[in-house]
Amino acid sequence: MTGKNVSARVGVTVTGGTPIFTYYAEPEACGTPASVRFYFQTNTSGKFEYTDYWWSDVAATTLESLKTGDQTLTVDFSNPSAWSDWNGQSGTTELAAFTAAVKDVQFVGLSFGGGCHFENGVGIAPGSGSAYFRLMDFTVTPTP
């Protein structure tokens, strides 16, 4: 994925009530609301390494904000400062590992979480309403 951008057009459709989005282990000190962001994984055939898993930092949005309109998220794989690993370390801090991971991407997609965690899952508070997440476009293109 070296030299590539990934973008996704996402939205939420409310189907009843006023859904309140939650995340696993809520509340936490970090306070980040239930969100969606990009994720990629490199080859994990060896022992577990924090730097095998990466999440976009800025290219993210809250599920609450998607109730009022669709958004397009975009992130550059060539920008290590736009990503953090499983342990929360920036791609600039772990530059060698980030560069190696980008050269050997095995999976790329979207991840849902909140609080201090980008991957802990999200849901809707019981009795608050109902909604569904929409993915209208997911594209990987060369960086301009």
What are the functions of these language-model segments?
Residues 1-4, 27-29:
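Extracellular and analogous surface-interaction loops
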Residues 3-5, 70, 103-107:
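Extracellular Ig-like/FN3 beta-sandwich strand-entry sites
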Residues 9-89, 113:
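Extracellular ligand-binding interfaces
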Residues 37-42, 129, 134-136:
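Residue-level signal for functionally critical sites in structured catalytic/ligand-binding pockets
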Residues 78-132:
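Extracellular beta-strand ligand-recognition surfaces/modules
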Residues 108, 135-140:
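Extracellular beta-strand elements of beta-rich domains used
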Residues 143-144:
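Short, solvent-exposed mixed-charge patches
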